[in-house]
């Protein structure tokens, strides 16, 4: 009998803290059709910048990660830069914000909102 190992490691991790915050924001908007879209654009002090927005529409080729019924959606171009990353929500002395821990980033800026590969 052959036993296959099933890896439960996701390509992109959507943390519990981030999912809870997104759920709260969706409730405030009173629109259960919203997803959190994470994307990457050119710019920032390190070459690429992370972006977050709410979206109601999924586009062809989008990938998604679900945590506690909340969906995180990523376009194909951004996805390739986010493989292995964790999307999290942090509240500390610097304020409250969504952050990305990205193992693909060679350098990041001081605030963590831009990176280079």
Curated annotation (Swiss-Prot):
Q: Which domain of life is it from?
A: Bacteria
Write down a Pfam family by its short name. Answer: Fe-S_biosyn
| Free-text remark on how the cofactor is bound | Binds 1 iron-sulfur cluster per subunit.
Q: Name one GO biological process term.
A: iron-sulfur cluster assembly
Molecular function, one GO term: 2 iron, 2 sulfur cluster binding
Is Iron one of the keywords UniProt gives this record? yes
User: What UniProt keywords apply to this chain's record, in alphabetical order?
Assistant: Iron, Iron-sulfur, Metal-binding
For activity, the cofactor(s) needed are: iron-sulfur cluster
UniProt xrefs under Gene3D superfamilies: HesB-like domain
**Residues the record lists as binding iron-sulfur cluster:** 45, 109, 111
Q: How does it assemble?
A: Homodimer.
NCBIfam families from the UniProt entry: iron-sulfur cluster assembly accessory protein, PRK13623.1
Q: Which PANTHER family match?
A: IRON-SULFUR CLUSTER ASSEMBLY 2 HOMOLOG, MITOCHONDRIAL
Of which family is this protein a member? Belongs to the HesB/IscA family.
Its biological purpose is as follows: Required for insertion of 4Fe-4S clusters for at least IspG.
Protein name per UniProt: Iron-sulfur cluster insertion protein ErpA
User: Which organism does this record belong to?
Assistant: Vesicomyosocius okutanii subsp. Calyptogena okutanii (strain HA)
UniProt lists the gene as erpA
